[in-house]
Protein backbone atom coordinates (compact mmCIF):
# COMPACT_ATOMS: atom_id res chain seq x y z
CA UNK A 1 0.00 0.00 0.00
CA UNK A 2 1.41 3.38 -0.97
CA UNK A 3 1.73 6.24 1.49
CA UNK A 4 -0.97 8.20 -0.33
CA UNK A 5 -3.36 5.26 -0.26
CA UNK A 6 -2.66 4.69 3.45
CA UNK A 7 -3.26 8.39 4.18
CA UNK A 8 -6.58 8.26 2.29
CA UNK A 9 -7.65 5.14 4.22
CA UNK A 10 -6.75 6.73 7.59
CA UNK A 11 -8.69 9.90 6.77
CA UNK A 12 -11.69 7.87 5.59
CA UNK A 13 -11.61 5.75 8.75
CA UNK A 14 -11.43 8.85 10.98
CA UNK A 15 -14.30 10.50 9.12
CA UNK A 16 -16.52 7.43 9.39
CA UNK A 17 -15.72 7.08 13.11
CA UNK A 18 -16.59 10.74 13.82
CA UNK A 19 -19.89 10.37 12.00
CA UNK A 20 -20.69 7.17 13.90
CA UNK A 21 -19.82 8.89 17.23
CA UNK A 22 -22.52 11.44 16.43
CA UNK A 23 -25.06 8.65 16.02
CA UNK A 24 -25.25 8.54 12.24
CA UNK A 25 -24.87 5.40 10.10
CA UNK A 26 -21.52 4.31 8.72
CA UNK A 27 -22.97 4.61 5.21
CA UNK A 28 -23.20 8.38 5.64
CA UNK A 29 -19.48 8.46 6.42
CA UNK A 30 -18.67 6.29 3.41
CA UNK A 31 -20.71 8.54 1.13
CA UNK A 32 -19.08 11.67 2.55
CA UNK A 33 -15.59 10.21 2.08
CA UNK A 34 -16.32 9.27 -1.54
CA UNK A 35 -17.69 12.73 -2.32
CA UNK A 36 -14.96 14.66 -0.52
CA UNK A 37 -12.34 12.62 -2.35
CA UNK A 38 -9.12 13.72 -0.63
CA UNK A 39 -7.59 13.41 2.83
CA UNK A 40 -7.37 17.21 3.12
CA UNK A 41 -11.09 17.61 2.47
CA UNK A 42 -11.90 14.75 4.84
CA UNK A 43 -9.83 16.38 7.59
CA UNK A 44 -11.75 19.63 7.10
CA UNK A 45 -14.97 17.68 7.50
CA UNK A 46 -13.64 15.91 10.60
CA UNK A 47 -12.81 19.30 12.16
CA UNK A 48 -16.34 20.51 11.40
CA UNK A 49 -17.86 17.41 12.99
CA UNK A 50 -15.71 17.70 16.11
CA UNK A 51 -16.39 21.41 16.61
CA UNK A 52 -20.02 21.77 15.55
CA UNK A 53 -21.35 18.30 16.45
CA UNK A 54 -24.32 18.57 14.06
CA UNK A 55 -27.56 16.95 15.14
CA UNK A 56 -29.01 16.43 11.65
CA UNK A 57 -27.64 14.49 8.68
CA UNK A 58 -28.69 17.39 6.45
CA UNK A 59 -26.13 19.64 8.16
CA UNK A 60 -23.39 17.11 7.48
CA UNK A 61 -24.38 16.88 3.83
CA UNK A 62 -24.57 20.68 3.52
CA UNK A 63 -21.05 21.05 4.92
CA UNK A 64 -19.76 18.28 2.66
CA UNK A 65 -21.23 20.07 -0.37
CA UNK A 66 -19.72 23.39 0.76
CA UNK A 67 -16.28 21.80 1.08
CA UNK A 68 -16.64 20.16 -2.35
CA UNK A 69 -17.73 23.47 -3.85
CA UNK A 70 -14.70 25.28 -2.43
CA UNK A 71 -12.38 22.61 -3.81
CA UNK A 72 -13.86 22.95 -7.30
CA UNK A 73 -13.24 26.71 -7.39
What are these regions (language model features)?
Residues 1-35:
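N-terminal acidic leader/helix
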Amino acid sequence: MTDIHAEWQRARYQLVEEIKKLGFPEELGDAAARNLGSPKAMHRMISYLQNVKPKKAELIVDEMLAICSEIEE
